Design a protein with these regions (language model features):
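Bacterial Sec-dependent N-terminal signal peptides
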Residues: 1-23
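Primarily secretory-pathway and cell-envelope proteins
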Residues: 19-46, 54, 95-143
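Solvent-exposed serine/threonine-rich low-complexity stretches and specific carbohydrate-binding patches
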Residues: 54-64
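Short proline/glycine- and polar residue-rich coil/turn motifs
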Residues: 62-68, 129-130
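Exposed aromatic-hydrophobic patches
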Residues: 70-76
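A short tyrosine-centered beta-strand micro-motif
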Residues: 79-85
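Surface-exposed loop/turn motifs at beta-strand-loop junctions within extracellular Ig-like
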Residues: 87-89, 142
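Acidic carboxylate motifs that coordinate Ca2+ or other divalent cations, activating on Asp/Glu
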Residues: 92
Length: 143
């Protein structure tokens, strides 16, 4: 009986871990690396990105940066993803805009050098997690 339960748990646990890959996110060149928070969101498709429904999102206080660099590893199953980053300098949990609608805080996307004012499409910054280790370096943009 115990052997059956153990075998069942190993099967369930093994199925859960199968396909889990390591994704390391690296960000540096913060305008102010000491104050504020970093908001990270991982998206799986255009519809979820458009509706701001992330697979995973979290906030990291900049006090946790090491020498002004953010580096964190997450586990994800095989698939396509896109990462959006906000340098939340005023710690209000959202992008702050000027009177003219220009972002006041830094932002960035995975594998995408954003050069316009328009919000990108998911296809602009998506990438595939297809091997056991994947590193994404995100460049922040400040206007």
């Amino acid at each position: 009986m115990k052997l059956g339960i153990i075998a069942f748990l190993v099967l369930i646990y093994g199925s859960f871990l199968y396909g889990q890959m390591s994704l390391t996110i690296e960000i540096d060149e913060f305008r102010n690396p000491k104050e504020g928070n970093i908001l990270i969101a991982i998206f799986t498709d255009q519809l979820n990105f458009k509706n701001d429904i992330s697979l995973k999102n979290w906030t990291v206080p900049k006090e946790k940066l090491i020498k002004g660099v953010f580096k964190e590893t997450v586990k994800l199953p095989l698939g396509e993803y896109g990462i959006a980053i906000l340098d939340d300098e005023d710690i209000n949990g959202k992008m702050s805009y000027s009177f003219f609608g220009i972002p006041k805080e830094g932002y960035g996307f995975s594998d995408f050098n954003h050069s316009g004012f328009k919000k990108p499409m998911f296809s602009d910054f998506k990438f595939s997690v297809s091997d056991s280790t994947h590193i994404i370096r995100i460049k922040l943009r400040y206007l």
